């Protein structure tokens, strides 16, 4: 065969061939064919290389064994190479209980023999010890070590058996009832068997093959499917036969070659086709046909079967394959790929023919590796080869052939093993010479043939019977047609042989008598005696008896055959039944599929109908449009001309016109962009001019900021909107203040006429009354003219400027958002609708420039004694509700705030509750001789605009002052915050009461240390007149005595629109809206603010300061009807460290926050003391987190690290304590990250807490001076915001974390927002400029949130913090990042 003729699956090899040895006859020729029982035997040859023993199935229930090496004892020559060896010594084995052998095999270590057999439809696997079989006597049947039953059906037969190639104690077996099992045996303890897996599949298993490593197994079934299984019979995957050949039947052979490759043969009619199946993961299965193995040339009625011998698979990648349809043994090997190897011509394995010249086919193949002698390649021994494996092939003619494998391939290393010299007892040589005299003496059987003709016997039966009589060896080899189920036939044959052998002369005598009597017929009759007749009768009876016995044997055989036929018929019926059931299932499945197809077709038809309807509708619409356009075209007279021109126009001209149009469009687009740029520039110029115009009424110090330029018109517009809103609020507030001042004068006059004064010791207000500090100054008449009103106002202004004390009035404001259930709410007492107008008018009123005041002053200053009188407007009074609240500085004090209910019920959209009136304790005024030498001590009292508690009914309790406090702070009255002026002598009594209460308080739990139940007592208020020093005198700073702690008292710098600053003085600074603060310096001076309020502040040991807001009172607020709306945070555990006290008044929509320790506060132009903790414009305070100096890009708007919560109008003031400094939510409370606290709050949220070593932060609040010393105490909870807190409508608010939020958390954008973000990770690189400064956490000062140190790089709404200004900074943003590439502006909103 040339190379061109070789297919891809065939490889011609020269280094691999076979050397043939002698051939041996093991049983007689099956010239009359095979019985069905013998056909069902799957493999008839098995060898044990470890023991050097080979087993051959010579009959359906009989085995023969012999030494494998004995095959090489017969030398081959040219003369005897075609001569059969008939005297091979073998041992005949009868197995106990075995009737029909189906399959057999030797395990991997060659110690046991497994036989799959069937007996009375019971299929079982018997495991025999090979050594016992060889060494025991053959007289008694051999008993197995253990027996394992396979299948449970009534009609069952063994199918196949396969030992695990890696684990010698494991085998798999199957039967025709679709059962399969995997068992594990124990040779030392045969009773201990283990069924690894047992199951029943959908088809009969016809082939089993283990993987080379023995980890898994593959089975092939009668439906042509290959299934990969685990030993527990768990299905790994399944594969059907080739898709292009759907008519294949059962699997006739299977061999697992490699991990993803199998040798598979499938039944194709009466033939079979062999394939290489390659199954790789995530790839289609490949099928490569082996044409050499698919070739069929046999005419024998044997079923198609493949016999793969895998003894060399692991070592050589070689499989010796026998095919029951061809007489050639093939080799499948792998070098580059799996192929069929074809050796040189004449060196392959060709099975011998029969005596009649008919080809034979293999019925068993095995490979033995126990040969240790060199192979003689020629008779003289001149050519030798190393010891090599021996291939054993058993033909259907009973011939066993042996062939040496001669391989010179370098990869084929020697794989021989030394076998044990196991002795086999009862070896006997075969004798097949008796076959020749069987046909020699037919004359001896002549008398026997006569009665046989009488009973219709055939000559063939006589020939068989003669062989039985003449040769005793025929008894040892039963007839092939003998019944399996009737052993009596064997016994009858034995009896017949014994009967004939006992009288050997009896057949000879009657045979001679007829010959003698046949010649002289006449003489022979009278000479016959009676004795002779009797002898003849006895002989005839014996002959008849023998014929009867033979007839009985035939009847037994026919009955056995009928029984077998019946069993086959039952099995066939079962198969037919199974097939019918399968067909029924297929029909059902087809019906189901048909229904599904019909449903799909119906759906498609419906879809097509819908589409047709839509198409018709579309066509109608198109027709309508076409009609309209045709009408339009018909109205054009020159339409045809235009169409003709368009048709006549060439493609080039069309393209040119299109290019011109495109160019014109591009030019137009460019012009549009230019116009857009010019419009932007124009807007920027307009915004700059607007900014310059507004700066005319602002403080000159604002002009010094280099951060007052905006980048774009959008930023300018947004910032102007914010400014207008803030200004509107300020104007409304100023207007209300003006009205309430005039109301105050008239109300004071009424108080005098009604003689409304009472004692000053214990004040308890049940009506909204106010103690006047301007007693006797108001006009006496009830009706005033315009001139008198102007005089009264001037006198009031002079008094206020001199004394610096202004009472807080209540302002009517409407809620910015009306309640949904306003009709159902009760106690509509308040309205905040005019607040925005008041603040706007207040901000737009020109203010007088203070000569020496510093907007960002951090040093002590001496304010001027003059203030702007523009706020005292001559307008009729509106509010008749006056609230006096006494607010705790930081630690609780003995006196509780007096809360009054309004006299009139105002129209409001927010329901409120009636407030109870806590006790206000005012000590009597006593003479103090040392008053001139000591600073004025006042009780700190700050009130919200409406009440000391929450706007919506939250009761407040003033905290107690610890016993370590040495001094108290006098009240800080203002137009917003009214307080009672108390002399130092009165404070001493208050202090004694406080100490008594504190002693009782210490016994309680720490959680309730800061709570006290006020003693409610109603008394009419008496007016108190505050003693004001006309001239400032030098005063020595009184140090605070400390017994337990040694914390230093920090001085609180002041900041206000006030008069000239005098260094080294005790300055009383007032903010625009009232109270100021006083710091201890070597000298003293007095100052009043624009509205005439003067305050004094002394260092008092306070753990934290309290803050009240418009919509929330001080600390320890009880729950209100509106939940946490306006609820203040709880006071933490008090500490003993002293701090500077501050009466803080916040103009905010958030409750006041209390903390465990305080920081020095900065100062804003609208509030003296600002929080060291920064706060957002609309939310809580912000702690600058440590984030990288880069922008992380777009982040999720949800709360990061749980630092803050909620969004705009979500939660409504729900305070939340967090371990992290949330900076995302501008409306949420900020948690304390250190041990200090502040009392500032933002416009819409309270101030938070700050770490002890952090720098001061800007604040945007309307509060008085509020500052306290640093204290190492437990961290305080953050404040809650009216418009912050927990999310009400989701965790990602519409106005949530980023747009108005504070400093971002770690990982978020560093320059996140104009109103938040712009945080700095280090104190040396703080954020600057814009609203971003409100949450930057730096020492900045701005118009709405001051700092302790004046900075140069500041803007109107946020100051710098000792940083170099960013090149791109604006009035409301920018310049917040040290990285110039990451500026902060309005465009940073996300």
From Swiss-Prot:
Protein topology in the membrane: Peripheral membrane protein
Region (Disordered): 434-530, 851-874, 985-1118, 1183-1280, 1342-1390
Record region (17 X 2 AA repeats of F-G): 1073-1373
Residues passing through the membrane, by range: none
Compositional bias of kind Basic and acidic residues: 986-1033
SUPFAM superfamilies: Nucleoporin domain
GO cellular component: nuclear membrane; nuclear pore
Subcellular localization(s) per the UniProt record: Nucleus, Nuclear pore complex; Nucleus membrane
Principal subcellular localisation of the protein: nucleus
Repeat positions for Sequence: 1073-1074, 1091-1092, 1111-1112, 1122-1123, 1125-1126, 1163-1164, 1166-1167, 1178-1179, 1244-1245, 1283-1284, 1289-1290, 1295-1296, 1300-1301, 1315-1316, 1344-1345, 1357-1358, 1372-1373
Pfam families per UniProt: Beta-prop_NUP159_NUP214
Keywords: Membrane, mRNA transport, Nuclear pore complex, Nucleus, Protein transport, Repeat, Translocation, Transport
GO molecular function terms listed in the Swiss-Prot or TrEMBL record: caspase binding; nuclear localization sequence binding; structural constituent of nuclear pore
Biased segments, Gly residues type: 1201-1210
Compositional bias ranges of the Polar residues kind: 434-455, 464-521, 1078-1090, 1342-1371, 1378-1390
Record note on quaternary structure: Interacts with caspase ced-3 (via propeptide); the interaction tethers ced-3 to the nuclear membrane and prevents its autoprocessing in absence of ced-4.
Protein name: Nuclear pore complex protein 14
Species of the source: Caenorhabditis elegans
């Amino acid at each position: 065969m040339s190379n061109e003729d070789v297919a891809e699956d065939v490889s011609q090899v020269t280094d691999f061939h076979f050397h043939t040895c002698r051939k041996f006859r093991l049983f007689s020729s099956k010239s009359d064919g095979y019985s069905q029982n013998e056909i069902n035997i799957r493999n008839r040859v098995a060898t044990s290389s470890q023991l050097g023993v080979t087993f051959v199935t010579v009959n359906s229930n009989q085995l023969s064994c012999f030494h494998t090496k004995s095959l090489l004892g017969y030398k081959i020559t040219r003369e005897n190479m075609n001569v059969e060896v008939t005297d091979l010594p073998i041992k005949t084995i009868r197995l106990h209980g075995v009737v029909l052998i189906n399959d057999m095999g030797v395990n991997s270590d060659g110690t046991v023999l497994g036989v799959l057999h069937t007996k009375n439809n019971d299929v079982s696997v018997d495991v025999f010890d090979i050594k016992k079989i060889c060494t025991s006597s053959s007289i008694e049947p051999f008993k197995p070590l253990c027996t394992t039953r396979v299948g449970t059906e009534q009609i069952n037969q063994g199918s196949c058996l396969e030992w695990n190639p890696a684990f010698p104690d494991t085998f798999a077996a199957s039967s025709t009832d679709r059962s399969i099992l995997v068992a594990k045996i124990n040779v030392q303890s045969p009773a201990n068997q283990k069924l690894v897996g047992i199951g029943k599949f959908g088809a009969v298993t016809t082939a089993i093959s283990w993987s080379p490593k023995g980890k898994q197994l593959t089975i092939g079934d009668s439906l042509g499917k290959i299934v990969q299984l685990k030993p527990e019979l768990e299905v790994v995957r399944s594969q059907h036969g080739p898709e292009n050949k759907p008519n294949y039947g059962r699997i006739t052979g299977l061999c697992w070659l490699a991990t993803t490759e199998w040798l598979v043969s499938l039944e194709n009619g009466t033939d079979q086709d062999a394939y290489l199946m390659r199954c790789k993961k995530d790839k289609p299965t490949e099928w490569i046909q082996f044409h050499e193995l698919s070739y069929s040339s046999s005419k024998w009625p044997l079923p198609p079967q493949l016999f793969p011998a895998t003894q060399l698979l692991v070592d050589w990648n070689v499989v010796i394959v026998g095919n029951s349809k061809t007489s050639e043994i093939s080799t499948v090997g792998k070098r580059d790929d799996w192929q069929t190897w074809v050796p040189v011509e004449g060196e392959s394995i060709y099975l011998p023919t029969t005596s009649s010249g008919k080809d034979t086919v293999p019925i068993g193949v095995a490979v033995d590796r126990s040969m240790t002698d060199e192979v003689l390649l020629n008779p003289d021994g001149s050519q030798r080869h190393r010891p090599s494996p021996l291939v054993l092939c058993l033909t259907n003619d009973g011939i066993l052939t042996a062939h040496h494998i001669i391989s010179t391939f370098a990869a084929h290393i020697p794989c021989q093993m030394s076998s044990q010299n196991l002795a086999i007892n009862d070896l006997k040589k075969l004798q097949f010479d008796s076959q020749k005299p069987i046909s020699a003496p037919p004359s001896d059987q002549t008398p026997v043939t006569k009665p046989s003709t009488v009973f219709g016997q055939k000559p063939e039966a006589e020939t068989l019977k003669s062989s039985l009589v003449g040769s005793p060896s025929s008894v040892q080899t039963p007839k092939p047609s003998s019944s399996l189920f009737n052993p009596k036939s064997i016994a009858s044959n034995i009896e017949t042989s014994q009967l004939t052998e006992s009288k050997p002369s009896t057949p000879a005598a009657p045979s001679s008598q007829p010959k003698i009597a046949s010649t002289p017929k006449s003489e022979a009759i009278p000479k016959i005696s009676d004795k002779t007749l009797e002898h003849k009768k006895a002989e005839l009876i014996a002959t008849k008896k023998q014929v009867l016995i033979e007839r009985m044997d035939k009847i037994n055989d026919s009955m056995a055959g009928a029984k077998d036929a019946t069993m086959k018929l039952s099995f066939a019926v079962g198969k037919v039944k199974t097939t019918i059931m399968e067909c029924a299932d297929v029909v059902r499945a087809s019906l189901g599929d048909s229904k599904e197809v019909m449903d799909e077709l119906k759906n498609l038809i419906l879809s097509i109908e819908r589409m047709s309807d839509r198409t018709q509708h579309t066509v109608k619409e198109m027709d309508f449009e076409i009609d309209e356009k045709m009408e339009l075209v018909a109205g054009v007279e020159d339409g045809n001309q235009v169409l003709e021109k368009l048709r006549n126009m060439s493609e080039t001209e069309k393209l040119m016109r299109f290019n011109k149009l495109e160019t014109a469009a591009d030019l137009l687009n460019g012009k549009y962009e230019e116009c857009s740029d010019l419009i932007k520039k124009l807007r920027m110029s307009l915004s700059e001019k607007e900014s310059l115009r507004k700066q005319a009424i602002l403080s000159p110090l604002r002009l010094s900021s280099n951060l007052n330029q905006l980048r774009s018109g959008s930023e300018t517009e947004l910032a102007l909107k914010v400014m207008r809103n803030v200004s509107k609020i300020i104007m409304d507030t100023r207007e209300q203040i003006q009205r309430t001042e005039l109301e105050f004068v008239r109300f004071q006059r009424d108080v005098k006429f009604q003689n409304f004064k009472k004692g000053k010791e214990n004040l308890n207000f049940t009506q909204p009354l106010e103690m006047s500090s301007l007693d006797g100054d108001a006009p006496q008449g009830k009706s005033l003219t315009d001139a008198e009103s102007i005089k009264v106002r001037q006198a009031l202004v002079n008094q206020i400027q001199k004394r610096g004390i202004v009472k807080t009035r209540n302002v009517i404001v409407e809620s910015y958002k009306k309640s949904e259930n306003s009709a159902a709410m009760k106690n509509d007492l308040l309205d905040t609708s005019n607040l925005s107008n008041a603040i706007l008018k207040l901000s737009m009123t020109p203010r007088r420039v203070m000569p020496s005041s510093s907007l960002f002053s951090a040093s002590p200053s001496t304010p001027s004694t003059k203030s702007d009188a523009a706020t005292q407007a001559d307008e009729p009074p509106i509010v008749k509700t006056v609230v006096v609240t006494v607010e705790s500085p930081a630690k609780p004090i003995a006196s509780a705030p007096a809360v009054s209910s309004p006299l009139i019920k105002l129209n409001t959209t927010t329901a409120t509750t009636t407030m109870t009136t806590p006790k206000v304790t005012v000590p009597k005024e006593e003479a103090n001789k040392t008053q001139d030498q000591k600073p004025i001590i006042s009780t700190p009292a700050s009130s919200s605009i409406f009440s000391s508690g929450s706007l919506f009914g939250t009761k407040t309790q003033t905290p107690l002052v610890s016993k370590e406090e040495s001094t108290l702070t006098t009240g800080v009255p203002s137009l917003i915050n009214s307080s009672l002026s108390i002399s130092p002598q009165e404070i001493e009594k208050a202090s004694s009461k406080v100490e008594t209460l504190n002693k009782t308080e210490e016994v309680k739990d720490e959680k309730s240390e800061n709570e006290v139940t006020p003693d409610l007592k109603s008394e009419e208020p008496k007016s108190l007149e505050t003693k004001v020093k006309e001239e400032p005198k030098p005063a020595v700073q009184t140090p605070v005595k400390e017994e337990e702690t040694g914390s230093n008292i920090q001085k609180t710098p002041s900041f206000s629109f006030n008069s000239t600053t005098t260094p080294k003085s005790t300055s009383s600074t007032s903010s625009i809206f009232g109270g100021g603060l006083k710091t201890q310096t070597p000298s003293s001076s007095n100052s009043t603010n624009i509205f005439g309020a003067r305050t004094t502040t002394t260092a008092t040991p306070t753990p934290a300061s309290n803050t009240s807001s418009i919509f929330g009172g001080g600390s320890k607020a009880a729950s209100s009807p509106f939940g946490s709306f306006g609820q203040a945070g709880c006071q933490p555990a008090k500490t003993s460290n002293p701090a500077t006290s501050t009466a803080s008044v916040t103009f905010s929509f958030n409750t006041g926050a209390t903390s465990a320790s305080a920081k020095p506060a900065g100062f804003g132009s609208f509030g003296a003391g600002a929080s060291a903790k920064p706060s957002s414009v609309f939310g809580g305070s912000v702690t600058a987190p440590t984030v990288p100096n880069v922008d992380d890009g777009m982040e999720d708007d949800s709360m990061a690290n749980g630092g803050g919560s909620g969004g705009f109008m979500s939660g409504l003031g729900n305070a939340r304590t967090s371990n992290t400094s949330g900076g995302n939510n501008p409306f949420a409370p900020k948690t304390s990250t250190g041990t200090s606290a502040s009392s500032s709050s933002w416009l819409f949220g309270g101030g938070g807490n700050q770490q002890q070593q952090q720098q001061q932060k800007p604040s945007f609040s309307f509060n008085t001076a509020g500052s306290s010393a640093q204290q190492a105490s437990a961290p305080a909870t953050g404040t809650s915001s009216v418009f912050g807190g927990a999310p009400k409508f989701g965790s990602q608010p519409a106005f949530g974390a980023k747009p108005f939020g504070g400093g971002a958390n770690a990982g978020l954008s560093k320059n996140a927002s104009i109103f938040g973000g712009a945080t700095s990770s280090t104190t040396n690189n703080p954020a600057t400029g814009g609203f971003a400064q409100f949450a930057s956490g730096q020492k900045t000062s701005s118009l709405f949130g001051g700092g302790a140190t004046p900075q140069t790089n500041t803007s109107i709404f946020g100051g710098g913090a000792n940083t170099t200004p960013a090149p791109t900074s604006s009035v409301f943003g920018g310049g917040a990042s040290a990285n110039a590439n990451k500026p902060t502006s309005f465009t940073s909103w996300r």
